[in-house]
Amino acid sequence: QLDSAVVFEEPELLAIGKKTIDSWFTQNMDMQLYKRYFYELFRQQKHVLSKEEEAILADVSDMSADVSNIFSMFNNADIRFPSIEGKEGEKIPVSHGRYTLLLESRDVNIRKSAFESVYSQYGQYRNTLAALYAANLKNTAFFAKKRHYNSSLEMALEGGEIPTSVYTNLIDTVHEHMDLMHRYVSLRKKALKAEELH
């Protein structure tokens, strides 16, 4: 409701024009506080729609947030991980908060058990999680298209002023040198005489 109520703000500010708003910064030093906001507003001007279109997107965004909310409830409230057994046979609870600590244990059995505890539970819900992921992709594709972005990736990076080439170059560079990671894992397995690393 709040989004719908203030949806007129950006289109009306853009209608005032950059020249007029820039003059405010010289006339009133208190306006300097908002310089970054207006810079971003005019930089992304082509992605701001009319008041009517913004109102529709505000209503739709409320519904589209459900995908994120459903995953958040599942991940933070509903999913439970089985306890694992410690060195002395004691039960060790597994949670999101403890998982990283358990993976840093010097005991390979604790690391392995913690990994299996978490991922066996997620594995049970893989179809649900895949459906949520697909719905999220459709949401972002919808908003990217309506706001005249070339892709969902471009929309996601726009706020940080990051060109998509930075992202794709990063992925390409990782792929290019993946053989080094494979070699490292292979050497580590050999040194530890292990079939799998945990």
Q: Where do the protein language model's features map onto the residues?
A:
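A well-structured
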Residues: 1-198
